[in-house]
């Protein structure tokens, strides 16, 4: 712990932040199983300190990261598949490859799920990456499947981009973006894409899972963890069950144990497959309201806002006045983006008390934190 504290006092690069976060989550997971409350408090304080410093690090470096690859530029959402998928497919040597994207899967949640897969799979590679801002599905997951920034998608594939102010699902075209990416990468052979948003869809895919065996690469987007975390705002039951991060991890574990996804992994192992497990962004439990003002049609996300005439204290948020520099579309000529940091959430002055009471201690995503941005990429081979 002293070593972690000492490291936090120095200047870390992106790779060192990844390693720091993995070690902190490892200790949190381990200590949540022990009775040592004193040590838990020490790690919790380190964690808060780390998230504060990580937010500063992102504010300082993010523009450089989006400018393009370089020695100290970490892997990010829009470069992930173009750079890593061809390598993984080559290593699979003709075996089926599955890309499993579990929405909202944080590093700590992966750490509790991983042991359940150890009997059937061995880990070939662990290489966490940085989820791009906003750490929200409409941006980060489209960027992942397109292998492009949101600004590039809006320009090159306008039929696949639904802007903030437009009606309709923002992620209805992932399949199309993925197909076009595979064409661009010269990936030959049959490919598949499946999105599971509820239990019935999961069971249906499991029943027909044998059909995926003939594809060279199959993407599976599994939304259930996302439903778990979003449900915290809608269902008091979840609020009771997941009162803190440790309870949230244990809820994730029991969900996974009984989900069709667990059985799909067993099927993949039977196929002798290469399996990639990743996500488009994580999530964080919020507790501190930060007041902002916006026009009536400003987006509803609690961790980022995009719009004209946003009112806020610049010291409270990370502001982006040149969206193009950050790979983001600009809905209007005067549009800016602002991002919440650490455990903050953005609230409007009207009805503020009710709003704060309702959303405090819920899991949200879209902003800047280790939990949202430093996310798993794990490659597994069937034993």
Task: Give the role of each language-model region.
Residues 1-383:
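Feature captures the catalytic ectodomains and active-site-proximal regions of enzymes
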